[in-house]
Amino acid sequence: GIVEELAKQYGIEYGYTEVYPTMENAQLAAGCDAVSVTPCDMSAPMLQRFHDLGVKAICCRSIGYDHIDLEKARELGMKISNADYPPEGVANFAIMLMLMSLRNAGHILKRGEVQDYSLKGKLGRDISHCTVGVIGTGRIGQTVLKHLSGFGCRLLAYDLYQSEEVKKIAEYVPLDTLFAE
């Protein structure tokens, strides 16, 4: 695969495991300069354990990195990186999944594979008649809300830190209200 090609091209040794890092299996990183993770426990004790094993960097394969104790990483001199995605791409993908779900696209595609073009179970809903809630109004959440605003649906938002820009197109509500509606 691509990882093997890049490792060979750049003279990098790597190991791989499907298990999430824990205090019990952290020794798998012994001798490694960096550990690449998806969002999982990267609390102070976990970072200390990796540091004690010689790990110098944590590379997070997600946009968010709030699961990493950045203060502890700084204290240990560990480098932290995360993946960067264009908010538009992620937002559009999320909206596509919403639309496909509302229109029963999965069912329609499966029925089409067997030449069933009847309407049974294929009628969906129109998003313009829906209330859509977005949890988290950072760059991606704001982009989702901006793009959805053109569909005419009612928009609700929840975030601990409210954005004045979001207030122009969505209503901030408590999390319980967002789930209920």
Spans of model-derived segments:
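N-terminal glycine-/charge-rich "phosphate-binding" loop or analogous flexible N-terminal tail
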Residues: 1-32
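Rossmann-like dinucleotide/phosphate-binding beta-alpha-beta segment
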Residues: 120-181
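Hydrophobic beta-strand scaffold residues
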Residues: 14, 57, 79-80, 155, ...
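Phosphate-coordination loops involved in phosphoryl transfer and adenosine-cofactor binding
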Residues: 31, 55, 128-131
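Structural alpha-helical scaffold elements that stabilize or flank donor/cofactor-binding regions
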Residues: 27-28, 49, 177-181
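Glycine-rich, highly charged phosphate/nucleotide-binding loops
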Residues: 15-24, 34-46, 170-176
